[in-house]
Amino acid sequence: MGPYLSQPNKNKTTTSGEGKSIIFAASEMQGWRNTMEDAHIHVCDLQQDLSIFGVFDGHGGKEVAQFVEKHFIEELQKNKNFKDQKFEDALRETFLKMDELLLTPEGQKEIIQIKGGDDEASYAGCTANVALFHKNVLYVANAGDSRSVLCRNNTNYDMSVDHKPDNYEEKSRIERAGGFVSDGRVNGNLNLSRALGDLEYKRDSKLRSNEQLIIALPDIKKVELNQTDKFLLMGCDGVFETLDHQDLLKFINQKLGNQQITPQLLGRVAEDLLDNLIAPDTSAGTGCDNMTTLIIYLKGK
């Protein structure tokens, strides 16, 4: 059996909500893929003036993405730097904490449960793209190739950069760790250079966590929001492979028009976006992945 269904599963799971300064919608669709391996988080007003959203695109199985979806916010809230409002350090440490938890006996047991009782070794991993809004500041932490794009002055302001093995710095680290890059893949296998999970690439005891073939360490971008910032678009790579960033923002803006922004409207727009991106067939290769998108609208901007 190949990676694709004979017909796409266009059923969507959509959630929307509203907080003090944010209206959001999240929608996910399995699409052409045999399985759904995406996960995401969305919490408005986790604390006063603080909201958090995230996309986790699984590979090699759904289990790591679902594990991170379950534990990320809980671990972030426990983090001392989070309590001290040192959000960049808190996000960085929480990304790394996910790998630590996966290595514990409890973590391994939970992975088996997510897999439906299959106790064979898991080779799964996931990307992580997490947006934290605090007052008028946005932090985006990224490991992998899920993305966040800010609609600023009606143009795209990219909040993350893909981590691909062909990137010079990433490739240099992979080679220092004893690996190689072939056809844009680490050791000819994984087409990401940073991810959560993928523990078989992180087992060299002589190397630190940020020196392994694959690392969970995120890049973090911080920006002060202003009156020209309208919304943040987040998504797994399947959302970004068909249209460029500017065209994606244009699609959303046209759908929003001059209507009053409500959670229900954003939910419909998110679903329309996925319907627009899915391929009519699998011949081209793009538009055939699982798709998850979040649209986070900034009130008063």
Swiss-Prot record:
Mn(2+) 1 binds at residues 57-58. SMART domains: PP2Cc. Coiled coil: none annotated. Binds 2 magnesium or manganese ions per subunit. It catalyses: O-phospho-L-seryl-[protein] + H2O = L-seryl-[protein] + phosphate; O-phospho-L-threonyl-[protein] + H2O = L-threonyl-[protein] + phosphate. Keywords: Hydrolase, Magnesium, Manganese, Membrane, Metal-binding, Protein phosphatase. It is found in: Membrane. InterPro entries: PP2C, PP2C_BS, PPM-type-like_dom_sf, PPM-type_phosphatase-like_dom. CDD domains: PP2Cc (cd00143). Its main location: membrane. Its cofactor is Mg(2+); Mn(2+). Mn(2+) 2 binds at residues 57, 237, 289. Residues 1-20 are annotated as: Disordered. PROSITE patterns: PPM_1, PPM_2. One of its GO terms (molecular function) is protein serine/threonine phosphatase activity. GO terms for cellular component: membrane. It is a peripheral membrane protein. The keyword Transmembrane helix does not apply. Residues 23-298 form the PPM-type phosphatase domain. One of its GO terms (biological process) is signal transduction. Belongs to the PP2C family. This is Probable protein phosphatase 2C 4. It comes from Paramecium tetraurelia.
